Structures are given as C-alpha cells and as structure tokens.
Design a protein with these regions (language model features):
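Short basic helix-loop element that most often maps to the first helix and adjoining turn
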Residues: 18-33, 93-100
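Short, charged recognition helix plus adjacent turn
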Residues: 73-100
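Short, basic-rich loop-to-helix N-cap that marks the start of a DNA-contacting helix
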Residues: 51-64
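Short alpha-helical DNA-recognition segment
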Residues: 28-46
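A short, Lys/Arg-rich alpha-helix, primarily the initiator
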Residues: 2-26
Length: 100
C-alpha cells in the first residue's frame, strides 16, 4: 500500500479512541465490564475515550479484549511511504543486512 498522506499523532489517537469506543458500544460492553475483560482500569478507559491518552500496552489490552487481535498482528506488515523518494530509498536498501 502506498499512501503519501500525513496524519498527526493526536489525530490518530483520536481516531483510535473513537473506533475503540464505537466497538465497545456496538458490543454493549460497559467501561467497567471492559476493564474486567482487559485488566485496564475503568478510569483509564474513560480518559482514553475522552482525552485520547493511554499507554501502548493498555491500548493493546483493550483492542484484544474487543476482538482486534488479528488486526494488531498485521499492523506493521505493509509499509506505507510518505514520498516517492522514501519508497525508492527503501527499495534500494531491501537487501542490506546491517546498519552503519
């Protein structure tokens, strides 16, 4: 997949929070129940849904509890390139074994 668009980390965190909240509501799961399912405290879930702040570990725990384990496993498989120059550089360096 080649995508040259950019999104800020804040915008991405907001989107992730909104998607997780929507999934939680679709499944009819309360924050307290999700807390029990995931091990992430309910106040942390509330803060994430409202302020988009959470640790990576807690986000992963929530995502797995809501059925996103497979999507997380493929998250970094397909590279996304910001520019053609970056794409060309990466293609040229595919066979490199070590960094400098």
């Amino acid at each position: 997949m080649y995508s040259f668009g950019q999104i800020s980390s804040g915008e991405l965190m907001q989107q992730l929070a909104e998607r997780l909240k929507a999934r939680r509501l679709e499944k009819g799961v309360s924050r307290q129940t999700l807390a029990e399912m995931s091990g992430v405290p309910a106040p942390t879930i509330a803060r994430f849904e409202q302020q988009y702040a959470i640790s990576m570990r807690q986000y992963i725990d929530l995502a797995i509890a809501l059925g996103y384990a497979e999507q997380l496993q493929v998250l970094m498989r397909e590279p996304i390139y910001k520019t053609m120059e970056e794409l060309e550089t990466i293609q040229n360096n595919k066979n490199r074994k070590r960094g400098r």
